[in-house]
Design a protein with these regions (language model features):
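Cytosolic/stromal cytosol-facing helical appendages immediately following the last transmembrane segment
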Residues: 2-8, 27, 114-118, 161-276, ...
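Central hydrophobic cores of alpha-helical transmembrane segments
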Residues: 321-329
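Membrane-embedded catalytic scaffold of the fatty acid hydroxylase/desaturase
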Residues: 40-55, 67, 71-228
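Hydrophobic alpha-helical transmembrane segments in multi-pass integral membrane proteins
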Residues: 48-55, 330-345
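Juxtamembrane "helix-exit" motif on the non-cytosolic side of transmembrane helices
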Residues: 25, 279-288, 335-341
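Transmembrane helix interruption/hinge and helix-loop junction motifs
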Residues: 1-5, 140-149, 337-343
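Membrane-interface helix-loop junction between the first two transmembrane segments
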Residues: 17-36
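Structural signature of hydrophobic alpha-helical transmembrane segments
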Residues: 2-15, 20, 287-301, 345-349
């Protein structure tokens, strides 16, 4: 198994594990459709742009590095990178709240209305792209790509943890690190709270630059952003903020829901599709320099599948049609034409076909009576 898969699988287990605990204990009413969208929001497209980020970093390091750390103790290299990465993230995050083009990317993350671990993986397709300029300075200074990647995983793991809904205040750690209690304030709907506590791992950046907020209201003011409630379609949600920013104000409202999809059918489809995403990462990793026809086809079908799941979750018929095309197209191409016969691919693709046929037959799908068309 590729080392890249381990944190992704752990993330998936923790997201559903925490959601299960919150549901069973009654500490939070879980919107399972929202959990699926959070996992589905970035998906394979975000991975492509993460690969682009890694490629850019490697190119800058190989061509423009000053190699300042070549003769420095590894201890100082790692310590510097830990702090410099987090400093860069603080300003990345702060400017994503300040500049409209960057907010158009970051708003997808803040639209989540439930504070739990799944919110930690809710992102725009373009999140990795807008982060590139803030970290390339590390490549210029001479931080090797391998060190950058490990430090990135460490910091993103802390940020993921800081979205959990189970951890209480952490005593003296609250004075040094960003904790869930700090980050919860950042996700409150009121803008005065959202424009504070930008730090990723260390809270002292906020204290140093005047953006720290310790105040917790006696009653939580709710999470998310003002305005129309987002849909479950990642294509729409990742691009609509840019249309609004450009003044395309006649963006169509969400169409009426034609049916209600059960949480079970949506979760099953999301997990099966994510199984193929894991297979994609196992096969291709960060490699986007030697792209094959098969890699391109798999990427496009997985992206289409994530959009289709969003349509199904929103109760749209086109979502069912697109899902059927994707789930039948995958085995037709990869098994029928390209002869992929590995048991893993056969099993997951067979599961997707069964899922699509069950959905088409009406399993997990109930007509929305308010939108029932007359016969």
């Amino acid at each position: 198994m590729s080392d890249l898969l381990v944190p992704i699988i752990v993330m998936l287990v923790l997201v559903f594990g925490e959601a299960g605990i919150l549901h069973l204990t009654g500490r939070q009413k879980i919107d399972w459709h929202d959990v699926v969208f959070n996992i589905n929001s970035g998906h394979i497209v975000l991975w492509l742009f993460r690969c682009t980020e890694v490629l850019c970093y490697g190119l800058v390091f190989s061509r423009f590095s000053l190699h300042l750390f070549d003769s420095v103790s590894p201890v100082w290299l790692w310590l510097f990178t830990l702090l410099a990465w987090d400093f860069g993230f603080y300003w990345l995050h702060r400017l994503h709240h300040t500049l409209r083009p960057l907010w158009a990317v970051h708003v997808v993350h803040h639209q989540g209305e439930h504070f739990n671990l799944s919110l930690g993986v809710r992102n725009s397709w373009y999140s990795s792209l807008t982060g590139i300029p803030f970290f390339l300075v590390l490549a210029v200074l001479g931080v090797p790509l391998s060190v950058f990647l490990v430090v990135s995983v460490l910091h993103y793991s802390v940020q993921f943890f800081n979205h959990n809904a189970l951890t209480p205040k952490l005593g003296w750690l609250e004075y040094l690190f960003v904790t869930p209690s700090h980050h919860r304030v950042h996700h409150y709907k009121a803008r005065r709270f959202a424009d504070s506590n930008y730090g990723g791992t260390f809270i002292f950046w906020d204290k140093l630059f005047g953006t720290f907020c310790r105040v917790t209201p006696p009653v939580e003011p709710g999470y998310g952003v003002q305005g129309e409630r987002p849909s479950s379609n990642p294509l729409r949600e990742s691009n609509l903020p840019f249309l609004r920013m450009l003044g395309v104000r006649k963006t169509r409202a969400q169409p009426p829901r034609r049916f209600n999809a059960s949480a079970t059918i949506v979760i099953a489809g999301a997990l099966l599709l994510f199984g193929l995403v894991l297979g994609y990462i196992q096969l291709y990793g960060y490699d986007i320099e030697r792209v094959t026809t098969q890699q391109t086809a798999l990427f496009l079908l997985l992206a289409a599948g994530s959009i289709a799941l969003g349509g199904i979750s929103d109760g749209q018929r086109w979502g069912v049609v697109l899902w059927l095309l994707v789930t039948l197209g995958l085995p037709l191409l990869f098994i029928g034409i390209w002869d992929w016969r590995q048991p893993y691919w056969l099993g997951v693709m067979a599961g997707l076909v069964v899922h699509a046929l069950a959905l088409l037959a009406g399993q997990g799908r109930r007509v929305n009576e308010a939108q029932r068309e007359p016969v």
